[in-house]
Swiss-Prot record:
Family (UniProt): Belongs to the calponin family.
Upper lineage: Eukaryota, Metazoa, Chordata, Craniata, Vertebrata
Distribution of this protein across tissues and organs: Smooth muscle, and tissues containing significant amounts of smooth muscle.
Phosphothreonine sites (modified residues): T170, T180, T184, T259
Location of the Calponin-homology (CH) domain: 28-131
Function of the protein: Thin filament-associated protein that is implicated in the regulation and modulation of smooth muscle contraction. It is capable of binding to actin, calmodulin and tropomyosin. The interaction of calponin with actin inhibits the actomyosin Mg-ATPase activity.
Protein name: Calponin-1
A family per Pfam: Calponin
InterPro entries linked: Calponin-like (IPR050606), Calponin/LIMCH1 (IPR001997), Calponin_repeat (IPR000557), CH_dom (IPR001715), CH_dom_sf (IPR036872), SM22_calponin (IPR003096)
Organism annotation: Mus musculus (Mouse)
Transmembrane intervals: none
GO MF annotation terms: actin binding; calmodulin binding
Keyword Repeat: yes
Gene behind the chain: Cnn1
Length: 297
């Protein structure tokens, strides 16, 4: 079996874009701090390339054995690929037992195949934070918050019952009885007040409450004629056949004698104009003047 590492082809498209974004999150200052911490604990040099020095898993196994003795029983010094992957797997199992959360731990291929160095760095920082909670003097990472457990005596717990809350007391027996659903009608009626009950339950008025028996009886559709006539007043009936320009009575006027629009109109009245007298045909026409054809008297 060849000792060469597994080779992965270059990434293209979306894979290359994701890889570049992960590489941009890598913190080189944190890398230097982790290098100094690991080299100081193990006493071994990692090399110029930080991730290549950790890829065989030997330094990682020795490092966790320093933090927690006996975490990794056997460290493989072989250069074979499966031996190196076994070392990385043993390191992952050891830091899980040490207390590092599973979602903070990298996968073996993230380090061995150089797919996600940012996650490897995050795992080492989480390991440093866990080491601080166990008493190790580490200048890397943030210390996890410790549990602050408190025990209270039963007498102390009973004292809490004497505290008056913001809504202590009685609500004077108020309840939501009689409440209607949002958007429904509300009848402003109380039998204690002695007011009349709402009669018309089918007509929705503009003002909530009772309409005192008023309804829409006799209302006509919008745009129809409105007859202004009241029998109680003793008025005569109006002409319902002709539509007048003004609502009400047109005093018997009609359109009788009206001609069709566009026809000539004869200005003639028999009271003022007499019947014309025409000359007889036997009389000579030269003895009569044109103005004698009509009797103007």
């Amino acid at each position: 079996m060849s000792s060469a590492h597994f080779n992965r082809g270059p990434a293209y498209g979306l894979s290359a874009e994701v890889k570049n974004k992960l590489a941009q999150k890598y913190d080189h200052q944190r890398e230097q701090e982790l290098r100094e911490w690991i080299e100081g604990v193990t006493g071994r040099r990692i090399g110029n390339n930080f991730m290549d020095g950790l890829k065989d898993g030997i330094i990682l196994c020795e490092f966790i054995n320093k933090l927690q003795p006996g975490s990794v029983k056997k460290v493989n010094e072989s250069t074979q690929n499966w031996h190196q992957l076994e070392n990385i797997g043993n390191f992952i199992k050891a830091i899980t037992k040490y207390g590092v959360k599973p979602h903070d731990i990298f996968e073996a291929n993230d380090l061995f195949e150089n797919t996600n160095h940012t996650q490897v760095q995050s795992t080492l920082l989480a390991l440093a934070s866990m080491a601080k909670t166990k008493g190790n003097k580490v200048n890397v990472g943030v210390k996890y918050a410790e549990k602050q457990e408190r025990r209270f005596e039963p007498e102390k717990l009973r004292e809490g019952r004497n505290i008056i809350g913001l809504q202590m007391g009685t609500n004077k027996f108020a309840s939501q009885q009689g409440m209607t659903a949002y958007g429904t009608r509300r009848h402003l009626y109380d039998p204690k007040l002695g007011t009349d009950q709402p009669l018309d339950q089918a007509t929705i008025s503009l003002q909530m409450g009772t309409n005192k028996g008023a309804s829409q009886a006799g209302m006509t559709a919008p745009g129809t004629k409105r007859q202004i006539f009241e029998p109680g007043l003793g008025m005569e009936h109006c002409d319902t056949l002709n539509v007048s320009l003004q609502m009400g009575s047109n005093k018997g006027a009609s359109q009788r004698g009206m001609t069709v629009y566009g026809l000539p109109r004869q200005v003639y009245d028999p009271k003022y104009c007499l019947n014309p007298e025409y000359p007889e045909l036997s009389e000579p026409t030269h003895n009569h003047h044109p103005h004698n054809y009509y009797n103007s008297a």
